[in-house]
């Protein structure tokens, strides 16, 4: 059933009149709405005897201007009314697309079957043989290489033996270190054991680590030798530098050489506190892991630090000699008194 509506296409004169009679935005929007209706009829290819649109632009121009709010409300209601119809049209479109894809797939499968029917089984086997021969030729071309680039010239069995020997050697080294650092008592009767899991933590007094360390007071050390230490950046004459106190200078030199610190600069007033902190830090690091300072190696004989040369007068030398004689006499008298006291 066709619906007929009295609407004509606007002529050229009407279009000129339309351009002259646009007093406000609301009327312009209304003109565009009517023009879109005319475009819709053309897209659907409806003849004039089915749908006919006639617009009298003169009468439309003489009408009072529409309120924008009224026009907006009417247009919004019309769009909301048309949205359900769009949703209804989407489902048959999807079904048509699915059907078309299935038909294309069936056509392709039929073409493949026809091609397979044309070729016999023997032809297919020959084609597979040709492919295999091509693959063998490719492998042969890839095998050719320069033998000089090979670093290890040994068979697979020899390479596997070397790898297994390397793994066993590393495991033995790790096991030895674990037993030495973690395990206190080794149970020889136990077949399966692990030094780290079976270890008994025995904290040493005054230390936080399981590695036993001891504090040693050395009167002289490896840093007292005059020649420079390789890799430390010290000059041979760096040991002769004095900060005013021989004991402080020796401790400073030992710590700086052990930590590979650059010497120099003024000595602060809290020098003893700094030395104490540095020594405690070194002891803590060695207690956590002895490997911290294993790279530091020293060679040569240990030599005492030579005190700075001083010039004394004859009177000062006589005083020192007399003081030394008195000290020796005092020690000898004390030794004699102790010996007589212990006699029965």
From Swiss-Prot:
MF term (GO), any: protein kinase inhibitor activity
CC terms in the record's Gene Ontology section: ATAC complex; cytosol; mitotic spindle; nucleolus; nucleoplasm
Residue positions where N6-acetyllysine is found in the record: 301
Covalent cross-link Glycyl lysine isopeptide (Lys-Gly) (interchain with G-Cter in SUMO2), where: 94, 118, 129, 139, 153, 235, 301, 304, 325
Domain of life where this protein originates: Eukaryota
Subcellular location: Nucleus; Cytoplasm
Assembly information from the UniProt record: Component of the ADA2A-containing complex (ATAC), composed of KAT14, KAT2A, TADA2L, TADA3L, ZZ3, MBIP, WDR5, YEATS2, CCDC101 and DR1. In the complex, it probably interacts directly with KAT2A, KAT14 and WDR5.
Protein name: MAP3K12-binding inhibitory protein 1
Species for this entry: Homo sapiens
